[in-house]
Swiss-Prot record:
Residues 127-149, 203-231 are annotated as: Disordered. Plasma membrane osmosensor that activates the high osmolarity glycerol (HOG) MAPK signaling pathway in response to high osmolarity. The lineage of its organism: Eukaryota, Fungi, Dikarya, Ascomycota, Pezizomycotina. Belongs to the SHO1 family. Residues 1-8, 59-63, 118-292 are cytoplasmic. Residues 233-292 form the SH3 domain. This is High osmolarity signaling protein SHO1.
Amino acid sequence: MARMDFNNIVGDPFALIAWLLSFATCVISDIQGAFPNFAWWAVGYMLCAIIGISLVLASQTSHVYGVAIVGYLAAGLTFTTLAVNSLIYDDQASKQAGAAGFILQSMVTIVWIFYFGSSSQTSSRPYLDSMGAGKEHPSYRNSKPLSTNYGARPETVVSGNQPPQMYTSAQLNGFETSSPVSGYPPTAANGAENGTQNRFVGPAIGSQSNLGGGSTLGADHPSTPNEVSQPTVYPYRAKAIYSYEANPDDANEISFSKHEILDVSDVSGRWWQAKKASGETGIAPSNYLILI
């Protein structure tokens, strides 16, 4: 269960102010004379929408209910727009003031639809957060299930066993062997060549006993299938849109704070190899970073 933080609601009062303006002016207009009933439906619907969104923001679960919120807000935008059309052309000042309140609600709704409907990696998301559009605290996103079950990750010596590497014939061009039977010690003519080939392919199953004590395969060509060399070039720069705490059970992950700048070597996967300004390197989830 997420921790309730009502500071998120206090920091974004525009929708509530617009609704109070619409409600007060609609009450005055209804007392003074005839008033369209549809405007009351818009007032009630937007009140329910504001309460629901306030609870979502307070519980910091907008990433869970974002799709549903966008659907409800789309209907609310239709209702407020129709309410404006039914009030703004009247000569009564209170109805025109009510139309102004619905216009403000429509503007806030448009911003909300963009905020909840866009990805957290968009460049405008931090700006909207600073202006109080959502103010979702990043700590709720920084959960352990994300770091352990997020997706495919680069395998290293520490993080696990890497499956055998498979190569195509084009990649092995130049490493062919002239020996008709695999698994026998290389001859003097093709020893170096087969030694290089065995580095990629290895002896046939059951033929290790045929190598004898004179085989120098391990000494001449040490095989480290689990080792992945660290990149030396980091051509990309990324900015952290949320803080992230590395999983203590995985030494390959790195922690970083919100708005911290990282150097990134590869942006093709879900986990990026990153380097901090302090020189610390490791992997970071791509949905916490945005390229700059």
